[in-house]
């Protein structure tokens, strides 16, 4: 950490407190960790990931949050309104130390134009999902979810493995950068198009990507060689997906699977139109935002049309939750929704059991603390073969960014067991300092997003946004350390509402009680949400877990 007002930020390490308690300290360190140069995409602009997803509204607001957290008593709660600390209230020790609301707008005004106008006026910020809720852990944060998605794809279409299969995708930013490693962990070959060569180089540095090949034909030739030999391999190709995907289709090249994780959710701040360098795009964005959006959407239409073309030629094609289809339709491509989103295609059965992205970070900064938690997870869930494979591969292949952290998908009935075991390890000194447990907002009961997590719900409840609000209220009542409700993450303003919660594992008896309640109730609501929507798998899970649903089965 530095004392400068806009310079490098790094979370404190070790066991010495700079706040009045570990719940406040956990929030402070994770906020700072979000802006660690090893973690954030553009830390000097407070941008963590996802196009323009920020940790705080301004540097002035950031330092005011830091000051407020350091002065916060153990029976007080800090309120953060879209990245700005607005008040501290006396509450009680079990209350969250921080409550956050990011990017929320009244529905009639919930569009990018209005949001940007308010953002320019200094009244709001875009929090994405884990940027503004202070629990981003770098590309690993999405890695296991991406691994699970490609594993489900392999099971459904390719006999349980991606060996000998080529997957084409685009986008190697903070989220999309997980794709090459997730594909190779499933034994496949990844062709990854990225418009910003610096991102390719960063993924190479972090060992998420194996090779960079600038020539398209040479990249395809190398991918086909790896396919024939059954060699897991990932290749980064500099280029614009709106140009490269159609070019591959015109060549008659058909990969086995195609998806995309460019920043299509934001046609102004994220996606780069075809025909522009990064510098030219930045100039156009500033000079003529309206034209920029039109050109970006036209490019997305071509990009999406190529994906439909691959599908028609036999490729398995799916949307990876960035709203490319929605923006492509606005760009004039009427058949944009011809292929499904990844949640209805592969992930919903896991959501029915409350399974989702369970993550934790070592506040000590000591990688040995994460090694101890890895062993604990392996001991707790030896029967979960996919989880065991993930932990073993992650230990070997995943480089920590910022504070050491781990993610794995656990469900209702499992998360609290892991949390309680971690608490025992902190209490006994095996883990040297408290850890923070949190999750992505992409979870089974914490999001309403009709183009992603709640696409195609059985009862038609895709757009019902009560569930993420109930999730935040439930986690607040259960004793979470900090809780956040956001708007627009993943798919853009006007298209999602979602919530997140974190709990500090401090080795105390009170900590154990908080952990058990938060990590039982949070995923259980995901089971309830899907049971209420009519999924029999979720109803069976609710009965097995003893969840009390007054109208279950009626």
UniProtKB/Swiss-Prot annotation:
Quote the pathway field: Amino-acid degradation; L-histidine degradation into L-glutamate; N-formimidoyl-L-glutamate from L-histidine: step 2/3
Q: Where are the transmembrane segments?
A: none
Q: Where does NAD(+) bind?
A: 50-51, 128, 174-176, 194, 199, 240-241, 261-265, 271-272, 320, 490
Q: According to its UniProt record, which residues of this chain constitute the active site?
A: 408
The Enzyme Commission number assigned here is 4.2.1.49
Function noted in UniProt: Catalyzes the conversion of urocanate to 4-imidazolone-5-propionate.
Q: Which UniProt keywords apply?
A: Cytoplasm, Histidine metabolism, Lyase, NAD
Record's cofactor remark:
Binds 1 NAD(+) per subunit.
Q: Which PROSITE patterns match?
A: UROCANASE
Please verify whether the record's keywords include Lyase: yes
Kindly provide the name given to this protein in its UniProt entry: Urocanate hydratase
Protein localization: Cytoplasm
Q: Which family does it belong to?
A: Belongs to the urocanase family.
UniProt source species? Rubrobacter xylanophilus (strain DSM 9941 / JCM 11954 / NBRC 16129 / PRD-1)
């Amino acid at each position: 950490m530095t004392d400068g007002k806009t310079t490098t930020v790094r979370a404190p390490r070790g066991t010495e407190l700079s706040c009045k308690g570990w719940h406040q300290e956990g929030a402070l360190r994770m906020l700072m960790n979000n802006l660690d140069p090893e973690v954030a995409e553009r830390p000097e602009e407070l941008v963590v990931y996802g196009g323009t997803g920020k940790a705080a509204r301004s540097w002035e607001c950031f330092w005011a949050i830091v000051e407020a957290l350091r002065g916060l008593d153990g029976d007080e709660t800090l309120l953060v309104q879209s990245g700005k600390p607005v008040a501290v209230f006396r509450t009680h020790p079990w209350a969250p130390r921080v409550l956050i609301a990011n990017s929320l707008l009244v529905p009639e005004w919930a569009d990018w134009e209005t949001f940007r106008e308010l953002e320019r006026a200094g009244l709001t910020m875009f929090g994405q999902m884990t940027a503004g809720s202070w629990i981003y852990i770098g590309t690993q944060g999405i890695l296991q979810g991406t691994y699970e998605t490609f594993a489900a794809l392999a099971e459904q279409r390719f006999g349980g493995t991606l060996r000998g299969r080529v997957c084409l995708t685009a986008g190697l930013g903070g989220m999309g950068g997980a794709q090459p490693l997730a594909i190779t962990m499933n034994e496949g070959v990844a062709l990854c198009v990225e418009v910003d060569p610096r991102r390719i180089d960063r993924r190479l540095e972090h060992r998420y990507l194996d090779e960079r090949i600038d020539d398209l034909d040479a990249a395809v030739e190398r991918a086909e060689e790896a396919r024939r030999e059954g060699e897991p391999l990932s290749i980064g190709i500099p280029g614009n997906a709106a140009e490269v995907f159609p070019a591959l289709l015109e060549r008659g090249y058909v990969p086995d699977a195609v998806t995309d994780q460019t920043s299509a959710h934001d046609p102004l701040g994220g996606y780069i139109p075809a025909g522009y360098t990064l510098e030219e795009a930045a100039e156009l964005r500033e000079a003529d935002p309206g034209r920029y959006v039109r050109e970006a959407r036209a490019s997305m239409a071509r990009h999406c049309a190529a994906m439909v073309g691959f599908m028609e030629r036999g490729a398995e094609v799916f949307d990876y939750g960035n709203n490319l289809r929605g923006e492509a339709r606005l760009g004039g491509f009427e058949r944009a929704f011809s292929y499904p989103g990844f949640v209805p295609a592969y992930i919903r059965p896991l959501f029915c059991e409350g399974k989702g992205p369970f993550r934790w970070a070592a506040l000590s900064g000591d990688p040995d603390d994460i090694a101890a938690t890895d062993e604990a997870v392996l001991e707790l869930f030896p029967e979960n073969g996919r989880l065991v494979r993930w932990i073993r591969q992650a230990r070997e292949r995943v480089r920590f960014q910022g504070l050491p952290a781990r993610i794995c998908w656990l469900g209702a009935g499992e998360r609290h067991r892991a949390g309680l075991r971690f608490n025992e390890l902190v209490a006994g000194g095996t883990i040297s300092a408290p850890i923070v447990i949190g999750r992505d907002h992409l979870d089974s009961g914490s999001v309403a997003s009709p183009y992603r997590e709640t696409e195609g719900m059985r009862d038609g409840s895709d757009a019902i946004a009560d569930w993420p609000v109930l999730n935040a209220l439930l986690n607040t009542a259960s004793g979470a350390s900090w809780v956040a409700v956001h708007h627009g993450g993943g798919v853009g303003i006007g298209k999602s509402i979602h919530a997140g919660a974190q709990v500090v594992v401090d080795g105390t008896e009170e900590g154990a009680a908080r952990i058990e309640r938060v990590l039982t109730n949070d995923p259980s609501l995901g089971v309830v949400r899907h049971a209420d929507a009519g999924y029999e798998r979720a109803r069976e899970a609710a009965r097995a877990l003893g969840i009390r649903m007054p109208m279950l089965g009626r």
